[in-house]
Amino acid sequence: MNDRQAALDQALKQIEKQFGKGSIMKLGEHSDQNISTISSGSLALDIALGVGGYPRGRIIEVYGPESSGKTTVALHAIAEVQAQGGTAAFIDAEHALDPAYAKNLGVNIDELLLSQPDTGEQALEIAEALVRSGAVDMLVIDSVAALVPRAEIEGEMGDAHVGLQARLMSQALRKLSGVINKSKTIAIFINQIREKVGVMFGNPEITPGGRALKFYSTVRLEVRRAEQLKQGTDVMGNKTKIKVVKNKVAPPFRIAEVDIMYGEGISREGELVDMAAEVDVINKSGSWYSYKEERIGQGRENAKQYLKEHTDIRDEISKRVREEYEIDGSSKEPLDEKEETLSLLDDE
């Protein structure tokens, strides 16, 4: 047994000498066994994700129909990263980012890194350079469907380019996945949906870009509008369902229901009223909502308005709800501690 252990120790020393310290270790020796996360900017989504937010160093795919709220979900995450002192980058392959809307959601547009690349190859090379720097906490690519290969742009209309985009994504993700993990960057890929022709049974919907992104993603979120939110006859927003269809760090298939209001994004007060009522932090009796035996509004909209006006009570309720769901942020790391990450990337 001692000979076997000595041989193993010798092999480990050789591996570390050849590939660098930390290239192999016992799992129990790893200093951080908890999953480090950054809040999604939505309490309901943090709870649905099971770990209190997006896991750092992982790939996230957000997909759904047009105008369902995919970019809104990503922009809320960027705002949360910036609020914690982190750096975020947005690769706008669709050339459709609205800076005024992003600002309304809490994004610091003066500090947001923005790229509007001409080709898919250029977009993914920029993404790789940003991730390899080790200085970017969140990278959003909007969208995979708009990552057009160079050959397609330079070709004629009507030319067939079978599988080009899928091959591009497959190669890019092979290169990116390892360095994303080492740099602790959260990479959010926004994707659209398409329909297969001639599917008689089952779901005909597919996401563009091949299968690679499905495999490499730690979390996949499906965003869909459920119903319109009206004030009188005016449509003020949409009730949106965000389904966690894949999750490698917690149980999947949980659903977060949020109100996405036009011009404002996700209503924090709306989801807080729903989640607090679910765990009896807020009491609901008939149409009345009350907190600590004090009535805060008749009907959901009035309760939302009360919390909007009384931010101290809103923050207190939010803290209690997070404690009830055990997502008090204990696994989070400071975003400005980059020295170890940078040294790991320099070793490459």
Swiss-Prot record:
Its biological purpose: Can catalyze the hydrolysis of ATP in the presence of single-stranded DNA, the ATP-dependent uptake of single-stranded DNA by duplex DNA, and the ATP-dependent hybridization of homologous single-stranded DNAs. It interacts with LexA causing its activation and leading to its autocatalytic cleavage.
SUPFAM superfamilies (alphabetical): P-loop containing nucleoside triphosphate hydrolases, RecA protein, C-terminal domain
Organism: Listeria monocytogenes serovar 1/2a (strain ATCC BAA-679 / EGD-e)
Keyword vocabulary terms for this entry: ATP-binding, Cytoplasm, DNA damage, DNA recombination, DNA repair, DNA-binding, Nucleotide-binding, SOS response
Coiled-coil ranges (or none): none
Main location: cytoplasm
Cellular component annotations (GO), alphabetically ordered: cytoplasm
Name by which UniProt lists this protein: Protein RecA
Pfam families found in the cross-reference section: RecA, RecA_C
Protein's gene: recA
